[in-house]
């Protein structure tokens, strides 16, 4: 029952529901690039113009788009085709790495539109996935469009808030993990997206937060909250590099830094808006000799930095001869590395954990000075350079 084609006319022929699932990346100014959706909409419209059908066709926009987009698409289709067409906004809430599970077990299905008949079609379409009636939510186009942006901005704000708290934790000797558990156990807050680190990235959060800023300006509003989310995220990456310089106790020019992790998160090769992009650039700008590794994302990162960075096949060889390690992605295999062996091969066994994913006691016993984010550091490590 599943067919593949690159022919749009063949794809939409006799279709009752047509999904538009094209990308809406950021333009250089931060606004949404709508060209892919506009092209898809026009091609669907041209294909429908050649058909004569006596039933309603529902166009479902899965793409993340600014408020007002679906309404404009509906007006365009109504003018350009004789077919009876309705447009529905149905934003996706899939997490990279667990998209199939999220699709099959949704915690909410948001459907925006103005046609009760289209709502009924969408309800019937999603019926096998609806375990509780309340997860199927209908609203107007603009509400559905803003729901997607608001959700991602809210999640990004939680990360940025915790990242800002790491500064206070470091200043007062608190532990951000204890703070996280303390506030996450509050039922009004919950534990999700409260892990501090060296910044957030990926294909959604940075793009959607930037777009929400532009959407706000379009109605004459300077969204200070959204601006702050972005500012904190950028500052956290700069602060990570500044902390390396501070703890090394000298200018970074000529220092050798090993970077472990290039993907924006573990279990993916996706480097879009990865904190590693900015952190490596900051290091290079300071004259650092950067050697980098990642179990999946290295081939995607190589075209970005080319020969500005030395590429290593594994963390052990990457750290050899380094003045410090910067851990930027929480790959689980980094927890089981031979840290004593690694420490013995480094110029100075210092590790900056941008994901708080390693254990202090293990790092201390391996002879590392260890600097996590917002957690007590290990500065009295055992000197085991002579032991392998």
Q: What spans do the regions from the language model cover?
A:
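Structural/interface elements that position substrates and couple domains in central-metabolism enzymes
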Residues: 1-388
């Amino acid at each position: 029952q599943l067919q593949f084609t690159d022919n749009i006319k063949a794809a939409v022929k006799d279709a009752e529901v047509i999904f538009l699932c094209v990308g809406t990346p950021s333009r250089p100014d931060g606004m949404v690039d709508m060209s892919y959706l506009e092209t898809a909409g026009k091609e669907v419209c041209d294909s429908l113009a050649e058909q004569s059908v006596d039933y309603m066709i529902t166009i479902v926009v899965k793409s993340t788009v600014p408020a007002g987009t679906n309404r404009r698409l509906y007006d365009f289709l109504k003018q350009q085709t004789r077919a009876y067409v309705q447009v529905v906004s149905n934003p996706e809430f899939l997490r990279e790495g667990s998209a199939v599970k999220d699709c099959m077990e949704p915690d909410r299905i948001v459907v925006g539109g103005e046609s009760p008949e289209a709502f009924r079609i969408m309800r019937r379409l999603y019926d096998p996935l609806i375990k509780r009636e309340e997860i199927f939510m209908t609203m107007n186009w603009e509400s559905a469009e803003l729901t997607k942006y608001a959700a991602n901005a809210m999640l990004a704000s939680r990360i940025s808030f915790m990242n800002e708290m790491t500064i206070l934790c470091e200043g007062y000797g608190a532990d951000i993990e204890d703070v996280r558990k303390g506030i996450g156990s509050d039922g009004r807050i919950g534990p999700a997206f409260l892990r501090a680190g060296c910044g957030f990235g990926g294909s959604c959060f940075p793009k959607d937060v930037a777009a929400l800023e532009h959407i706000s300006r379009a109605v004459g509003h300077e969204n200070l909250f959204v601006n702050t989310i972005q500012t904190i995220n950028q500052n956290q990456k700069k602060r990570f590099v500044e902390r390396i310089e501070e703890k090394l106790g000298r200018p970074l020019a000529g220092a050798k830094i090993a970077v472990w992790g290039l993907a924006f998160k573990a279990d993916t090769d996706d480097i879009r808006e990865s904190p590693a992009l900015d952190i490596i650039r900051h290091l290079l700008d300071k004259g650092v000799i950067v050697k980098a590794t990642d179990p999946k994302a290295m081939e995607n990162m190589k075209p970005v930095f080319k020969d500005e960075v030395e590429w290593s096949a594994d963390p052990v060889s990457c750290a050899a001869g380094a003045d410090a390690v910067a851990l930027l992605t929480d790959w689980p295999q980094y927890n089981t590395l031979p840290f004593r062996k690694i420490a013995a091969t480094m110029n100075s066994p210092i590790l900056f954990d941008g994901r708080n994913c390693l254990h202090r006691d293990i790092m201390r016993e391996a002879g590392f000075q260890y600097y996590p984010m917002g957690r007590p550091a290990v500065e009295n490590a055992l000197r085991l350079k002579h032991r392998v």
